[in-house]
Amino acid sequence: MIDTIAALSTAQGPGAIGILRVSGSLVMPIALAVLEKNQKPLTETFLQNQKRSAIFCDFVENGKPLDQIVFFYFPAPNSYTGEDLAEFHLHGNPLLLKRALHVLFEKGARPAQKGEFTKRAYMNGKINLSGAEAISRLIEARSKYELELAQKNVFGEITKLSSKIRSDLISLKAECEAEIDFSTEDLTFESLEERKNRMVALKNLCSKLIKDSERAESYILQSTVVLYGEPNTGKSSLMNLLIGKDRSIISDVPGTTRDYIAEELSLDGIPIRLVDTAGIRDTTDNIEQMGIERSKREADSANVKLFLIDTSLPFEKQSFLLKHKDRLFGSLIVANKIDSKHPSWHTESIHDIQEEFQLTISEISCKTKQGIPELLELLKSKLTSKDDTEDLVLLEDRQRYHIQKIESCLSEAIQLMENNAPAEIYIQEINVALHEIGQVNGVVENEEILGRIFSKFCVGK
């Protein structure tokens, strides 16, 4: 008998609907014990005839209706877990859901562990390990790019690629074994050059997969964008404008921002940590100076530095360069306050700086919001300098480890072939590579590894 598990499958907190999921051998007895329709208990025959259909009925506790619900019954093996599975769709009041879940426990279910439903799906062959990890990534995705990459894996991109690698490895192994076993027979085998070329192509596929995954990783890692510059250039105003709330104090008094302030936001699906820093200036105030030093460290470690300058002040090229030359390199220059631009800030002066230092300059006004959409597009291109995610694939750390091992095995096998080693020697590397590719999709016997993977899930998944 398979023990029966139950858990809340929707998010914690109030909502229109809350779903309780139950899986295991006691699904039918539990359902019959807690469901009524027109004040009459449901029958097993009725539920079997209504499988995979929505049944409107009452959920009862101690013979009294607790809630009007929609019930779904999915008999094995045609369910998410591969076991008998049921879903109770109740109104999404947390107290109501807690009481209903307690009733299910009283009738023989036990609380599910994190990821246990998906683990059962894996153990029953409904999904492979790559698919399970993709579901976890899909649920936890924090950005548009991560969601797109997770969706590709849910629909089997990793499985397809690893299946190709496995198929090619089996083909190589079969050719090597045939040569070893039938070397005295009058048979024709592929040339060593052809075999080596196949290994090189397979190794290159693994290398590309790893590199593509590293590129994909850059899409989903949070980027740090630092607003940097002298006091009163509009850093705090731009910070508040970009995050849509008054997070930084705005004042005409220099030195108002004494320390850096960080906020998280999403720029068209790109996760960003936006940092407003203390204005850079010479000061005798020790506390302000400490804030300036911390701001410089933040700027040095940023993915993108937005160096703000105040165009309402007079511009003189030589003094400007003398003051800011070291800060310009590696920065995206944001020329703020163009709504009140000083006459000395004519177009040629900006172009001169742009050409001399090969800089990108964005002209904006935080006051009128002029140039803000263009700045955001420029920032997005700086952060991504990315292509579309269409040709990329995202490997989990565990998967990447095994693909790297395969790449290493193939490199070793190629080296052995070039040194005229017999097939009996380099076939061992192919055998190890085959073991590693099995680990990618789920030929994993280690319970500790499985536990680590599925513990990342929420309880109801």
Swiss-Prot record:
State one molecular function term (GO). Answer: GTP binding
The coenzyme or cofactor needed here is: K(+)
Domain TrmE-type G as annotated: residue spans: 222-384
What's its EC?
A: 3.6.-.-
At which positions is Mg(2+) bound? S236, T257
UniProt subunit comment: Homodimer. Heterotetramer of two MnmE and two MnmG subunits.
Upper lineage ranks? Bacteria, Pseudomonadati, Spirochaetota, Spirochaetia, Leptospirales
Q: Which family does it belong to?
A: Belongs to the TRAFAC class TrmE-Era-EngA-EngB-Septin-like GTPase superfamily. TrmE GTPase family.
Q: What is its main location?
A: cytoplasm
Protein name listed in UniProt:
tRNA modification GTPase MnmE
Keyword line: Cytoplasm, GTP-binding, Hydrolase, Magnesium, Metal-binding, Nucleotide-binding, Potassium, tRNA processing
